């Protein structure tokens, strides 16, 4: 077949195959055009999931009558004029492909009016064939009407899903837009009935967050806002216990544009690390802002992907920002406490450095109420400052556990508790977040009372996290040591792996590897991380090189180290049926409040739960 120039209509239909995947793609392109035109209100009318009708009306700047034919021609745009503009583009659209592509596969009408014009104008296109520009009554702004999508491309139309499915894709994209632009009012109708309205609000509004993702997400989300190196990351991340089975609540925006990026997703997953239960996904709404010249948005026709010019810097910035935010999720902290004042907001102060108590040898049978035990190093009752002076704290405990006048003693000589509850200070502002221990349930759970109600703590999970964080701090302070191999190893690798090893020699050395390149496809390994001396060095090194090539860094060594320390902490934690004394339980609560990530154990399970007095009252139908 001879080479020939394709007709314009066919060219547009081929372009539509990249830009117009389904009705949601049409809505995305048209609404983004409206926002680029300065619209503050957008009305979206749909019929049959957008297959029969998509109508987008906005109150933006409008289009002049003489520019209407130009607006639906290929590669015509008002947003860029030079390569410099393309490299620093800040608008959502810039290719000039959307309108002609959509018009080539639908019955298309474009109507618009400039604010200073006496009347509007309209242009009709059917299957890519232009009509005449005609005057029309129209409010300032633009209306785009798309009817019978893919009417002239039956092969594309038959691949569309059911009406409910197509509508669901549109609603999901509108949710994403509503999160990014809370200042814009969005009104949606389907088959002639109003289906959703997003009211305009303040930028980064908590109200819009709850309206879009639900009150559960908004109630426990942590606010993040950090700047550095010309970057700013802000938004919300869900606390680890609010995890998902899928990635349906992961929203990333780069300079206001909703995108998917593997590097950032990897950084977020790493930040959640050992606080997320196995197989669960984090939820977040994150806005990354940077100079447009540092990111290439001209990567994908639908602009779903971007390419960062400093991908490693972005990865590290996101990872460290979120890791620091999640580290403040101490047990007892409310979402509002985290990131606003850190430990100081919880009244913890220097507790983290002091540990809130010290370990002593197990008192065994000589310790009243200690039980049989399982090698648990019991807690000395020395506590870090909690807002109460030492004499006040001791008086509070004495008031709680001292026998009432004339009370009998148990057979083991311990006093029978009077049942008077917490001391008078229990409802004062000086009560620590996890309150004071009241009892132990089945040797597994600590029951404590705080100002809001009942606190239930899984003592093994909590102690496991405390021990784990202390082990990590100890190892972080001494760094990773390298252990020389008795017989240096020659490793056959691919050329790309060898190039990575040579380029990242300093990074590998910091991880404990001493490696030199001995050939185009071979490496000479002289030492490996001492902590992982029993691991398979060949498999470990290949994994690390793969991480460095894909993400610019590797936490595989740290992850393997953390798994080892986690196992050590798990074996050293207090076991079920170990009876703790009240001072031991309270010391454990204080250490939880002072320990980073103590809301989850090393495996991502929750360590504590709060039941407010109002919730408990509802169980018993009180106040009704």
UniProtKB/Swiss-Prot annotation:
Keywords: DNA damage, DNA repair
GO molecular function: ATP binding; ATP hydrolysis activity; ATP-dependent DNA damage sensor activity; mismatched DNA binding
InterPro entries recorded: DNA_mismatch_repair_CS, DNA_mismatch_repair_MutL, DNA_mismatch_S5_2-like, HATPase_C_sf, MutL/Mlh/PMS, MutL/Mlh/Pms-like, MutL_C, MutL_C_dimsub
Keyword DNA damage listed: yes
Family in the record: Belongs to the DNA mismatch repair MutL/HexB family.
Job description of the protein: This protein is involved in the repair of mismatches in DNA. It is required for dam-dependent methyl-directed DNA mismatch repair. May act as a 'molecular matchmaker', a protein that promotes the formation of a stable complex between two or more DNA-binding proteins in an ATP-dependent manner without itself being part of a final effector complex.
Name of this protein: DNA mismatch repair protein MutL
Record organism: Xanthomonas campestris pv. campestris (strain ATCC 33913 / DSM 3586 / NCPPB 528 / LMG 568 / P 25)
Source organism phylogeny: Bacteria, Pseudomonadati, Pseudomonadota, Gammaproteobacteria, Lysobacterales
């Amino acid at each position: 077949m001879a080479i020939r120039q394709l007709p314009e209509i066919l060219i547009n239909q081929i372009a539509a195959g990249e830009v117009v995947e389904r009705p949601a793609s049409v809505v995305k392109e048209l609404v983004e055009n409206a926002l680029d035109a300065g619209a503050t209100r957008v009305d979206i009318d749909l019929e049959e999931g957008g297959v029969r009708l998509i109508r987008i009306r906005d109150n933006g700047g409008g289009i002049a009558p003489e520019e209407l034919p130009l607006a639906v021609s290929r590669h015509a745009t008002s947003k860029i004029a030079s390569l410099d503009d393309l490299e620093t583009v800040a608008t959502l659209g810039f290719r000039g492909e959307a309108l002609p592509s959509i018009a080539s596969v639908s019955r298309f009408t474009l109507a618009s009016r400039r604010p200073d014009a006496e009347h509007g104008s309209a242009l009709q296109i059917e299957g890519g064939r232009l009509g005449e520009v005609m005057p029309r009554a129209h409010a300032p702004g633009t209306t785009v009407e798309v009817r019978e999508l893919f009417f002239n491309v039956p092969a594309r139309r038959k691949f569309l899903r059911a009406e409910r499915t197509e509508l669901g894709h549109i609603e999901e994209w509108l949710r994403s837009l509503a999160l990014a632009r809370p200042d814009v009012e969005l009104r949606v109708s389907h088959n002639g009935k109003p289906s959703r309205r997003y009211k305009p609000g303040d930028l980064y509004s908590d109200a819009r967050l709850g309206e879009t993702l639900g009150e559960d997400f908004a109630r426990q989300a942590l606010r993040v806002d950090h700047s550095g190196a010309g970057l700013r990351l802000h938004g919300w991340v869900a606390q680890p216990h609010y995890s998902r089975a899928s990635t349906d609540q992961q929203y990333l925006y780069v300079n206001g544009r909703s995108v998917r990026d593997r590097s950032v997703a990897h950084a977020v997953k790493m930040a959640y690390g050992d606080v997320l239960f196995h197989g669960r996904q984090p939820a977040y709404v994150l806005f990354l802002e940077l100079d447009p010249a540092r990111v290439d948005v001209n990567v994908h026709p639908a602009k779903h992907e971007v390419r960062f010019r400093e991908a490693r810097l972005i990865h590290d910035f996101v990872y460290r920002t979120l890791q620091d935010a999640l580290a403040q999720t101490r047990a007892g902290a409310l979402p509002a406490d985290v990131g606003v004042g850190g430990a100081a907001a919880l009244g913890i102060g220097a507790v983290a450095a002091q540990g809130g108590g010290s370990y002593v040898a197990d008192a065994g049978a000589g310790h009243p109420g200690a039980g049989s035990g399982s090698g648990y190093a019991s807690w000395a009752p020395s506590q870090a400052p909690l807002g109460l002076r030492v004499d006040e704290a001791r008086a509070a405990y004495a008031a709680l556990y001292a026998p009432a006048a004339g009370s009998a003693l148990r057979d083991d000589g311990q006093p029978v508790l009077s049942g008077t509850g917490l001391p008078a200070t229990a409802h004062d502002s000086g009560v620590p977040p996890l309150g004071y221990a009241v009892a132990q349930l089945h040797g597994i759970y600590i029951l404590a009372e705080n100002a809001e109600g009942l606190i239930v703590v899984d003592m093994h999970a909590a102690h496991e996290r405390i021990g784990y964080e202390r082990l990590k701090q100890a190892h972080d302070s001494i760094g990773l040591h390298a252990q020389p191999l008795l017989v240096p190893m020659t490793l056959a690798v691919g050329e790309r792996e060898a190039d990575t090893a040579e380029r990242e020699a300093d990074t590998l050395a910091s991880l404990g590897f001493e490696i030199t390149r001995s050939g185009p496809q071979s490496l000479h390994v002289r030492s490996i991380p001492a902590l992982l001396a029993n691991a398979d060095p060949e498999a470990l090194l290949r994994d690390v090189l793969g991480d460095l090539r894909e993400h610019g860094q590797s936490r595989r060594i740290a992850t393997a180290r953390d798994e080892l320390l986690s196992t050590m902490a798990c074996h050293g934690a207090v076991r079920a049926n170990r009876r703790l004394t009240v001072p031991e339980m309270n010391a454990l609560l204080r250490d939880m409040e002072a320990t980073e990530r103590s809301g989850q154990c090393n495996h991502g399970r929750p360590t504590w739960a709060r039941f407010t007095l109002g919730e408990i009252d509802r169980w018993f139908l009180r106040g009704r």
